[in-house]
């Protein structure tokens, strides 16, 4: 990879985390940055945006430029939707990924779906409720057999426990 391309790719990875405007992303792509470049941990710009950036316009710009929303990072095999479910505070980021075709019930290497990750790790209840509203499998179980409801109980997420039961989760 040419030094200038490497520099552009590093700038794109940084912009995915911190940019607030679509133009910041588009300019780097137009200059030749690789939309699916990887950082040292194997994360792509869309994964970083989903995990750290709450900006819907940045996520949309990356997707419109051809970001692979299905690619999974190498360590845990989590994709952009998993990372957003685990970390974002903006449910619109979840919606943008799903509108672009992200698999709502894709599993990482532990068998966790985005909903399991949201219930287990994300303190923003609205992320889990958004996933439920959009049709996530409320009876999904990880590879150890723990259900979404199990994780909600373990995390003492009373509102989610009640919502899941109301929706028929077991």
Tell where the protein language model's regions lie, with residue ranges:
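Conserved ankyrin/ankyrin-like repeat signature
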Residues: 24, 57-58, 92-93, 126-127, ...
